[in-house]
Amino acid sequence: MTRSIKKGPFVDAHLQKKVDEQNEKGTHNVIKTWSRRSMITPDFIGHTFAVHDGRKHVPVFVTESMVGHKLGEFAPTKTFKGHVKDDKKARR
């Protein structure tokens, strides 16, 4: 289910505070965050977030097409290493 419109988007208060401070100063420094659940709002456009994926912080540059999605969608938590080829010749 999606979130109710009357509630509005969820953004962690500390993250919104950092974005507001940078918008006032006119700077666009990287904002390190562990808040993967925060929704991207229009005032995040042009900022770069370092979103934690459980191991490291992945840089995510926010564009217009990302508005309405969550930060965690752009920092995958699992790395796919590929399927191992099961071949008799490879074992020799």
UniProtKB/Swiss-Prot annotation:
InterPro entries: Ribosomal_uS19, Ribosomal_uS19_bac-type, Ribosomal_uS19_CS, Ribosomal_uS19_SF. GO terms for cellular component: cytoplasm; small ribosomal subunit. Keywords: Ribonucleoprotein, Ribosomal protein, RNA-binding, rRNA-binding. Gene3D superfamilies: 30s Ribosomal Protein S19, Chain A. It comes from the Bacteria. One of its GO terms (molecular function) is structural constituent of ribosome. GO terms for biological process: ribosomal small subunit assembly; translation. Protein S19 forms a complex with S13 that binds strongly to the 16S ribosomal RNA. Belongs to the universal ribosomal protein uS19 family. This is Small ribosomal subunit protein uS19. It comes from Bifidobacterium adolescentis (strain ATCC 15703 / DSM 20083 / NCTC 11814 / E194a). The gene is rpsS.
